[in-house]
Curated annotation (Swiss-Prot):
Binding residues for Mg(2+): 253, 262
Parts of the chain that traverse the membrane: none
Phosphoprotein is among the record's keywords: no
Species of origin: Pseudomonas aeruginosa (strain LESB58)
Protein name, entry field: Protein nucleotidyltransferase YdiU
Length: 486
């Protein structure tokens, strides 16, 4: 095991030079204290799960202390925000502290969010608030537990530093981990500023360190873009299958690695609503739940445009054309598994779409429906679920088709139950649960956020005494729209 103050650094991105980032030191927050830490994320750096030295966490990630090998830098990038190009964004409140190598030889970026002002702060104060930091921490660790690729969160540090958003709040920092923090917007920045040499330098860097298998291809950059398309098709399929709504799918929030990145006003669906908008700033619903698939394709097309100096347009288009069929294949496979079906059949897509149509407008909890469906035999489970649907006759027709499908596939009920429980979570990160943990933390009580994190790290297992985390939201917690302010 390593110790927190003795990590091995290899700052590859910093070596790209000043065109890609600016050296900035963290601005310390006052009276830093550890709010919550993730044992699973600590393990990625070969660190012990126990956070016995909370003072060291607070010093390092509150900006008061820095490793001698760290090279904190603010990265420059641009991006399309709600469909409009913003020519200069960059890390306005976050710093890439450096890259740490673990014992397996993996590189992990250490990125401190809320580290203070940078040249890219755009009139902002460079701070993150406790509320948004806790939300990002919880999601960064909850999604991987569901099998959804994501950046990770090591810890949240609270403080007494005041910041003003809609109201006075307290500043916090979040230490984010990812194999890379390169975004679609990095490529867009160098493309639209016509810095094509730097664009190629960035592409070569990403190719070498994150898509090395593409080097053997006849046209490596074309092969790399195809893999980016493939990864994003699978990522979005997982979002849709598990009812995750990102909320701000700007191109600067899209990771080149195809992982969930830059959490803001996200939500998991409570009642199923294909048109759910979780971001209260998204008046037009550009980033609604149902729009995530076409928006991901749109964002990939924006990245493709930025790569035109390196890849032939026909090759980029051919890869883009793969996105939808790849997405559909991944999504149908996941939904088939959530329904307890192990073998593909011709009418599976219709079976899934009919179920979602029946759910729309009904008081059906999206996550608990699948969990309850696997609890008992199909006949008994379907009978107990029937009352949640508005059009019960239509549900009965779907239920009969599903029952026949299960019967045709065969197998015993216990095996079916185990399969379904392995892919259908009992615990999901509902906004009302996060809000309750945040409100307690804002009063200095971190018990709830730590307990919620612990429960969400094992979403498929029944955890005695944790039944309250399975409950549907109260009236005040249904369909919450979250602010972008953070």
């Amino acid at each position: 095991m390593k110790s927190l103050d003795d990590l091995d650094f290899d700052n590859r991105f910093a070596r790209l030079g000043g065109a890609f980032s600016t050296e900035v030191l963290p601005d310390p927050i006052a009276e830093p204290r550890l709010v919550v830490a993730s044992p699973a994320a600590l393990a990625l750096l070969d660190l012990p799960a126990e956070t016995s030295d909370e003072a060291l966490f607070a010093e390092l990630f509150g900006g008061h202390k820095l490793w001698s090998e760290a090279e904190p830098r603010a990265m420059v990038y641009s991006g399309h925000q709600f469909g409009s190009y913003n020519p200069r964004l960059g890390d306005g409140r976050g710093l890439l502290l450096g890259e740490v190598i673990n014992q397996a030889g993996e590189h992990w970026d250490l990125h401190l969010k809320g580290a203070g002002q940078t040249p890219y702060s755009r009139m902002g104060d460079g701070r993150a608030v406790l509320r948004s930091s806790i939300r990002e921490f919880l999601a960064s660790e909850a999604l991987p537990a569901l099998g959804i690729p994501s950046s990770r969160a090591l810890c949240v540090i609270g403080s007494s530093t005041p910041v003003w958003r809609e109201k006075k709040e307290s500043a916090a920092t979040l230490l984010r981990l990812a194999p890379s923090h390169v975004r679609f917007g990095h490529f867009e920045y160098f493309y639209y500023t016509r810095q094509h040499d730097q664009l190629k330098q960035l592409a070569a860097f990403v190719l070498e360190h994150h898509f090395a298998d593409c080097n053997a291809a006849e046209r490596p950059y074309a092969a790399m873009f195809r893999q980016v398309v493939e990864r994003n098709a699978e990522l979005i399929a997982r979002w849709q299958a598990y009812g995750f709504c990102h909320g701000v799918m700007n191109t600067d929030n899209m990771s080149i690695l195809g992982i969930t990145f830059d959490y803001g006003p996200y939500a998991f669906l409570d009642d199923f609503d294909a048109n759910h908008i979780c971001n209260h700033s998204d008046d037009a619903g550009r980033y609604s739940f149902s729009n995530q698939v076409p928006i991901a394709h749109w964002n990939l097309a924006a990245l493709a445009q930025a790569l035109t100096p390196l890849v032939e347009v026909d090759e980029l288009r051919a890869s883009l054309d793969l996105f939808l069929p790849l997405y559909q294949a991944h999504y149908l496979d996941l939904m088939r598994r959530r329904l307890g079906l192990g073998v593909a059949a011709e009418n599976d897509q219709a079976l899934v779409q009919e179920l979602l149509q029946r759910m729309q407008g009904s008081a059906v909890d999206y996550s608990l429906f699948f969990r309850r469906l696997g609890e008992e035999t199909p006949e008994r489970a379907l009978a107990s679920l029937r009352d949640d649907f508005v059009d019960r006759e239509a549900f009965d027709r779907w239920a009969e088709a599903y029952r026949r499908r299960v019967e045709e596939e065969g197998g015993d009920q216990e095996s079916r139950r185990r399969r379904m429980h392995a892919v259908n979570p009992l615990y999901v990160l509902r906004n009302y649960l996060a809000q309750q943990a945040i409100e307690a933390a804002e009063q200095g009580d971190y018990t709830e956020v730590r307990l919620l994190h612990q429960v969400l790290s094992r979403p498929f297992e029944e955890q005695p005494g944790m039944e309250r985390f399975t409950r549907r939201p109260p009236d005040w917690g249904r369909h919450l729209e979250i602010s972008c302010s953070s």
